[in-house]
């Protein structure tokens, strides 16, 4: 990634490169951050440092795709995970089947949970499976659990609510549900359990576009 040239959470990379008198710099991909966006390369060249850009650019763009997505959209990079049979089913009609995937795929899912900042499901999954949505890989970090629950149907006795003080948990609902008088007692109990509530505007459940923007603001 192009060396940064602004003061953020860390000092400018360009300053230390100049200070250490590094003669040549090879850049894979340019920084899409408007605070950098080519300025880092120009500063180095202005100080007589040889800079070559575009080294393995496609590979670098892929490597940094999460960063590029966030820095240009200010919304989370989302990966969809789903499992289904060859005929397009995810479970038996009776609900008897527990696993569609095998052990290898399930292990990969938990590795993904350890790598990604959050995991999102709908209220239907919570009601049907009462999941923990934690990371079960040794040394892994539990992701932030995000539940899309338009009308706040999440049971207070669910695993999600009972463990919200241990694992960061967000419940996204409609703004209407968040402001409804009849929901205030439940909202109080959810907050006491350690759950953060996010309301979104919209006539058809949780507004995912608005939710992504609000989640991005929490980074």
Positions of the model-derived regions?
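Zn2+-dependent cytidine deaminase-like catalytic core
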Residues: 1-59, 144, 175-179
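Short, flexible helix/strand-to-coil boundary loops that buttress conserved ligand/catalytic motifs
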Residues: 29, 64, 94
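Short capping loops/turns at secondary-structure boundaries
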Residues: 33, 37, 53-56, 71-75, ...
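Short Asp/Glu-rich motifs
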Residues: 36-37, 63-64, 132, 209
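Proteins enriched for Cys/Gly/acidic motifs involved in redox and nucleic-acid/cofactor modification
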Residues: 41, 55-83
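Active-site ligand-binding patch in enzyme domains
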Residues: 69, 79-86, 90-218
């Amino acid at each position: 990634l192009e060396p940064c040239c602004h003061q953020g959470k860390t000092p400018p990379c360009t300053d230390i490169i100049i200070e250490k008198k590094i003669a040549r710099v090879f850049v894979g991909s340019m920084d899409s951050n408007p605070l950098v966006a080519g300025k880092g390369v120009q500063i180095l060249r202005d100080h007589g440092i040889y800079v070559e850009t575009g080294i393995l650019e496609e590979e670098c763009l892929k490597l940094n795709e999460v960063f590029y997505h966030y820095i240009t959209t200010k919304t989370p990079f989302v990966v969809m995970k789903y499992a289904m049979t060859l005929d397009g089913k995810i479970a038996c009609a009776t609900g008897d089947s527990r696993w569609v995937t095998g052990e290898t795929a399930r292990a990969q899912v938990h590795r993904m949970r350890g790598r990604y900042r959050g995991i999102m499901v709908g209220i239907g999954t919570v009601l049907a499976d009462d999941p923990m949505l934690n990371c079960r890989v040794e040394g892994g970090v539990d992701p932030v659990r995000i539940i899309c629950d338009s009308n706040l149907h999440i049971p207070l006795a669910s695993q999600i609510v009972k463990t919200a003080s241990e694992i960061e948990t967000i419940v996204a609902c409609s703004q209407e549900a968040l402001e409804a008088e009849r929901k205030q007692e439940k909202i109080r109990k959810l907050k006491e359990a350690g759950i953060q509530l996010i309301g979104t505007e919209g006539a058809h459940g949780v507004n995912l576009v608005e939710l992504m923007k609000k989640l991005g603001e929490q980074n």
